[in-house]
Amino acid sequence: MATLAADTRDYVVADIGLADFGRKEINIAETEMPGLMALRAEYGASQPLKGARITGSLHMTIQTAVLIETLTALGAEVRWATCNIFSTQNHAAAAIAASGVPVFAVKGESLADYWDYVGRIFDWESDNDGRTANLILDDGGDATMFALWGAKLEAGETMPPPENEEEVEMQRALKAFIAAKPGYLTKTVKAIKGVSEETTTGVHRLYHIAKKGELPFPAINVNDSVTKSKFDNLYGCKESLVDAIRRGTDVMLAGKVATVAGFGDVGKGSAQSLRNGGARVLVTEIDPICALQAAMEGFEVVTMDEAVKRSDIFVTATGNADVITAEHMAAMKNMAIVCNIGHFDSEIQIAALANYKWTEVKPQVDLVEFPDGKQIIILSKGRLVNLGNATGHPSFVMSASFTNQTLAQIELWTRSEQYQNDVYVLPKHLDEKVAALHLEKLGVKLTKLTQKQADYIGVPVEGPFKPDHYRY
């Protein structure tokens, strides 16, 4: 059960007594997050985020705590919630709450609480002072959608009928928020200078809204910064996926057959993760380019219908829906392990198993028994396995992602008038800056171009070194 502080109700955490433990781990993480620490040193005195009120929706982990404290060190005020019901690290949330930042996050929170907490991070008003959020930092798009749909409802529009429990709770929370604070979300949307979005799924939502001409403020697509997608998505998953599967099941990967659905950056890292553990890896793909990449990396590319007959472990990494169906799971081997490393829980038809016998082995590990007696293991109920069953990506790779997020927030706050209501990526020179900030920690020494060499290839001596269309 969540506990509240005696002197304030402006946070919800599992146990505020975990704050000291959280602070110790935050201190360690700071030594592995050179990009964020460099931004504190560079911008701390100038306070470029002074006056910014950031509504943040992103996994409440130790690494996110370092991001939050970087934003506040640069002058921002922050209200924070997690973006996944299983991803919170309770000691991290406690440490941030104890520092005075309003945070609403409990590992294993209900969907009802999740959406109520999204409402809490938008409620900036104190004593009817009229304050609202003026920036959003999002992961998956839930906070952005809450604000946009809130403004639409206040304008008299209606939402489509909910199709699942998630949508039921979102609509309930929105209506409750509007009833308590009518007109406030409309005012909020007008005040927002922009949103920076962390992940592939959220970026897809933003592009969809922008294509319809309905995006009311600029958005920065952090996910497609090279120092995010080619590092967090690839190298992060390469380390965190097998960590989660092993913590959840104690399975020996060596010799097993594993299937990865999707061979984008996350799928590439996941497939390498499993292969490095000794598994024989199959890949499913819809895209001929990604399928060819997988084949030339030595992976066997098959359909899911074939994979279910052969595999012991299944990982979805597509960002799509119904990738593993109830029929697929019914055809799997006894004690097959099924999990997802995409942002939402739509990739595996978990709801279709609701009427079968579920046995919780431990938190985020369930045995599901089919009518014929066969069982499969479901991790994190089909939600993000690396954050549900483990602690997510290592601090170092998250430093690159969160340095991008911080730079995006500075860009939106200080230069928003230079952006239209569209989706942008950070300029190449900032992408290269993020990479450069992480080299010393690894002992990397860059070669410097001479002026003659720079002229020869047509780039500045100090960069940027690649055109925007270059594919790393």
Curated annotation (Swiss-Prot):
Cofactor(s) listed: NAD(+)
Please tell me where NAD(+) binds in this chain. Answer: 199-201, 233, 262-267, 285, 320, 341-343, 386
Biological process terms in GO annotation? L-homocysteine biosynthetic process; one-carbon metabolic process; S-adenosylmethionine cycle
Give the transmembrane region(s). Answer: none
PROSITE patterns, sorted: ADOHCYASE_2 (PS00739)
| EC code(s) of this entry | 3.13.2.1
Location comes to:
Cytoplasm
Sorted keywords for this record are: Cytoplasm, Hydrolase, NAD, One-carbon metabolism
Task: State a single Pfam family of this protein.
Answer: AdoHcyase_NAD
- Answer yes or no on keyword Protein biosynthesis: no
Q: Which family does it belong to?
A: Belongs to the adenosylhomocysteinase family.
- What is the role of the protein in this entry? May play a key role in the regulation of the intracellular concentration of adenosylhomocysteine.
Protein's name according to its UniProt entry: Adenosylhomocysteinase
Provenance organism: Sphingopyxis alaskensis (strain DSM 13593 / LMG 18877 / RB2256)
What gene does the UniProt entry assign to this protein? ahcY
